[in-house]
Amino acid sequence: MAAPVVIRDLPDIGVTVVSRWVFNCYVVHDRGDGRPMVVDLGLPSQLPVVREVLRDHGQDPDDLGAVIATHGHVDHVAGLTALRPDDRVDILLPRTVEDMLAGSRALRSPGPAAMSRILPVVAEQPRDWSALGEMRPLMGRIGYDRRHIAFPRTPDGWLDDGASLPGGSDWTVVHAPGHTDDATCLYHAPTRTLISGDSVVSFEGRAWCNPEYVDAAHSASTAERLRSLPVEHLLPGHGLVVTGSDVMGEAWSHDDRPPRSGRLRALWRIAVDRAAHRHG
């Protein structure tokens, strides 16, 4: 049986989390001009839930101002395929994706060995194998990997480092390469909130500069930059929300590893759950 969609309201910062397993999507209810925006619409099935969340908050789903991706991997953009041609919503992607589409920048993506480093993160959220099944046929058809890049429509705008998001927003774009070349975060200084995409994940209540990366030097530079931001609310691309007085100051580095006991517990949970799913 599939795990239910996890919906968590964070009223102190005006955000609702919509998660299926590790596919975290964030609804920001006021981007600055009263209109909502969505960050990392990773699955097509998340869009109806996002619309329901907006209605529950007294907002018109048709007033959605933007859908933003922190980077172009399929698990952060696959939900774009659910948008209707007549949806009046801007799609915003990191500026580096423009170079990838033009062929002037190589397509780099972490390999299996690097991906295995975040398995402990995968175990912490309610497993929903059907979510993985939903995404699998979209691999290679949307977003990018090492060989392909494609999006359902031309983006309406690009995210530039240091720029504010549209709509008179207090959200600032932070280019954060390392996990990928286009990796991007969004920072909201008034609430000290960081939507980190895959630049920072979380495990056991602690931020973790992503150990799954294509460029270690860039990862180190990104970690140093993000540690300089006062962050009390971390909204990661994968993993659970982390709150605290100095979330990034206490973060693991990209070359740190959680305690072995925690990793083993996480892998055991995944193995048991997968076996139950296969025989359920």
Residue ranges and their predicted role:
Residues 42-45, 144-150, 164-251, 256:
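Metallo-beta-lactamase
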Residues 55-157:
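Active-site HxH/HxHxD metal-binding segment of metal-dependent hydrolases
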Residues 37-39, 68, 91, 193-195, ...:
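Residue-level marker for buried hydrophobic side chains located in beta-strands
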Residues 2-57, 185-202:
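Conserved beta-strand hairpin/beta-sheet module of binuclear metal-dependent hydrolase folds
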Residues 261-280:
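C-terminal regulatory/interaction regions
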Residues 37-40, 63-69, 173-175:
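Short catalytic-loop micro-motif centered on adjacent basic/acidic residues
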Residues 11, 86-87, 230:
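Short, structured coil segments at secondary-structure junctions
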Residues 155-165:
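Short internal loop-to-helix segment that lines adenine-nucleotide cofactor pockets
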